[in-house]
Amino acid sequence: MADNNKMSREEAGRKGGETTSKNHDKEFYQEIGQKGGEATSKNHDKEFYQEIGEKGGEATSKNHDKEFYQEIGEKGGEATSENHDKEFYQEIGRKGGEATSKNHDKEFYQEIGSKGGNARNND
């Protein structure tokens, strides 16, 4: 406790947080999180989200190794496959192919085709 039997701001915040967590359930936190996200999205632009995403990605990459990314990728893939059907994958494959074709030329496809053929021959 701070001087004169007064709580510090930090102590008061911690106690308030503990009390709140005892009095509310998961749905409460989901609801206030959604409201906060909506309010934030109204106040910030695309660049803001790109910047915080980049900073978060850099911080995460410093704290995790290759196995971490393999594990979360596998979990994400499993969750996605449980929630989507064949048509979903056909659609995202088509969109990805279109985007790739806009960004690459004939030489790119010749190079990756050659690499794929070489890899297959080495198996």
From Swiss-Prot:
InterPro entries: Stress-induced_KGG_rpt, Stress/Virulence-Domain. Residues 1-29, 41-109 have a biased composition (Basic and acidic residues). Pfam families: KGG. Keywords: Repeat, Stress response. Sequence repeats lie at residues 13-32, 33-52, 53-72, 73-92, 93-112. Residues 13-120 are annotated as: 5 X 20 AA approximate tandem repeats. Residues 1-123 are annotated as: Disordered. The keyword Metal-binding does not apply. Induction: Glucose or phosphate starvation, and addition of decoyinine. Also by heat shock, salt stress and oxidative stress. Involved in an adaptive response to nutrient deprivation other than sporulation. Glucose deprivation induces sporulation and several other adaptive responses. PANTHER family: CONIDIATION-SPECIFIC PROTEIN 10 (EUROFUNG) (PTHR36569:SF5), PTHR36569. Consists mostly of well conserved tandem repeats. This is Glucose starvation-inducible protein B. The lineage of its organism: Bacteria, Bacillati, Bacillota, Bacilli, Bacillales.
